[in-house]
């Protein structure tokens, strides 16, 4: 019985997070497109595969610049979010520069991609917080 409760809780939370992400990306399509590129590059890197980020670092940086260059949708427009979006752009551009220079080790590329991924998850976390700070 306890395992059934755990499984149902896991499924409910997974569904809730999926619905929340779809709502966020529906309100902020550029962020959704950024996520599409990030997910296809980050998850392979967890197994040591840097080929996807090497192929798509420019696209990742471009979407980060688009996200940062557009107004943040009203429900999410807070000081912490604005600051984190700028950090996302900075880390994504840094990732692209590392790849384009061609001198970074595989470990350094994976570490930078992981850092970029962590900043993205900070954006997701901030999107779930109460939105009281609009200036």
Label each region the model flagged:
Residues 35-44, 68-72, 96-98:
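Acidic/histidine-rich, surface-exposed loop or edge segments in extracytoplasmic proteins
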Residues 112-135:
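A charged, solvent-exposed segment within the mature domains of Sec-exported extracytoplasmic proteins
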Residues 64-82, 99-101, 105:
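Short, solvent-exposed, charged loop/turn and helix-capping segments
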Residues 51-58, 78-86, 106-115:
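Short, charged, amphipathic alpha-helical segments
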Residues 1-24:
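Bacterial Sec-dependent N-terminal signal peptides
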Residues 21-58, 129-132:
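Immediate post-signal-peptide N-terminus of mature secreted/exported proteins
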Residues 45-48, 102-107:
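Short helix-adjacent coil turns
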Residues 30-37, 56-63, 87-94, 119:
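Amphipathic, well-ordered alpha-helical segments in soluble domains
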